[in-house]
Amino acid sequence: MFKFAPYLLKTLWRHRSRTILTVSGSAVALFVFCFVGAVQRGMNDLETRQESKQSLVMFQANKFCPATSNLPQDYEEKIAKLPGVRDVVPIQVYTNNCRASLDVIVFYGVPPKKLQTARDFKLLSGSWAEFEQNQDAAVVGRAVAGRRGLKTGEKFSIGPLTVQIAGVYSSNDPAEENYIYSHLEFLQRGKNEDLVGTVTQHE
């Protein structure tokens, strides 16, 4: 292949104008492609930030680990009456480790009927009906499912919790794919203690 290099170089040198135009055109096309991609990504990031600004998360102050926060669940009604509040989602959080770890498992317990409106998830497998109808059901983020080898229909246990996987979801926010969402009441009763009436946070 290299024996043709001298001929190639001679051809490029003899037709310098055409070579310059070809290289310049390719460079401009690549620049436009990168510029449009950067603008599109910037607009998507801006839209995501604007959406996130519309949410406020409240949990108990002075807690090193948010999962240890305890707030009255009936705050939901009081918060819902505040001007500008469209909806309130009480959330119970359980994590197997509050310290830095490469494999922290985080459960979010939410009212099952509110999950689809509170989060923009797409089910890759399973069904929302299965999740909503069974109290021990959970939907698992794609990242967690990949790390743990979890599939729809299987059971997953960690600590005192055992859930039936009703589905695996994806999200536009990669961080969300590291969580497991279960029923609020299941998580309140699932740690050998009765936490009914209290939640970790309101969103």
Language-model features: locations:
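N-terminal Sec/SRP start-transfer signal
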Residues: 1-32
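Electropositive phosphate-/nucleotide-binding environments in soluble metabolic enzymes
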Residues: 2, 37, 41, 181
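Amphipathic alpha-helical segments that mediate coupling or scaffolding at interfaces
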Residues: 11-12, 46, 50, 159
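Short, flexible helix/strand-to-coil boundary loops that buttress conserved ligand/catalytic motifs
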Residues: 23, 47, 119, 191
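Hydrophobic, regular-secondary-structure patches
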Residues: 27, 31-106, 127-134
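Hydrophobic secondary-structure segments that place a key small or acidic residue at a functional site
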Residues: 91-92, 100-111, 122-197
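Short helix-loop capping/hinge motifs at secondary-structure junctions, enriched
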Residues: 113-118
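"Rare, low-scoring activations can occur
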Residues: 200-203
